[in-house]
Each structure stands twice: as structure tokens, then as C-alpha cells.
Design a protein with these regions (language model features):
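Domain-level signature for soluble enzymes in the chorismate/prephenate branch of the shikimate pathway
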Residues: 1-80
Length: 80
């Protein structure tokens, strides 16, 4: 496989990530609206900590685990 093909695969993955990110943000907005309407706090530290543990457990090495932790901390911060 050459560099162009590898970059093409990365481009496809990146497009999927963008689509999934936008879907996640829309659902997060709905969750926040629900919480506000029902008098709940939007920020749920326990839920975020559990989410971080779960996604880190899905990785295959320490490097990816650290990257996924940073990624999801950022995603969750932006979706509050």
C-alpha cells in the first residue's frame, strides 16, 4: 500500500469521525435540554469519569489509552 492510499484511508476515517462527532453533539444537546427541563445539573462528574474508564478500557495500549482519555475529556467539555 502506498502513501496516497494510506492517506485516503485516514481521510475516510476523519470524515466518519466528523459525522459521529456531530451526531454526538446533537444528542448531548438533547440530554442537556432534558436535564435543564427536569431540574438536574448538566455536569455529571461521576458519569464523565465512568465514560473515561469505559473508553480507555477499549484501547489496546497505553499510548492509545492516554490519547482517548484526552480526546473524550475535550469532547465532554465541549458538550456541556
Amino acid at each position: 500500500m502506498d502513501l496516497t492510499e494510506l492517506r485516503g484511508q485516514i481521510d475516510e476515517i476523519d470524515s466518519s469521525i466528523v459525522d459521529l462527532y456531530e451526531k454526538r453533539m446533537d444528542i448531548s444537546r438533547q440530554v442537556a435540554e432534558y436535564k435543564i427541563e427536569n431540574g438536574k445539573q448538566v455536569f455529571d462528574k461521576a458519569r464523565e469519569e465512568e465514560k473515561i474508564r469505559k473508553v480507555k478500557s477499549q484501547t489496546h495500549n497505553e499510548f492509545n489509552s492516554h490519547g482517548v482519555e484526552e480526546l473524550f475529556e475535550q469532547i465532554m467539555s465541549m458538550s456541556r
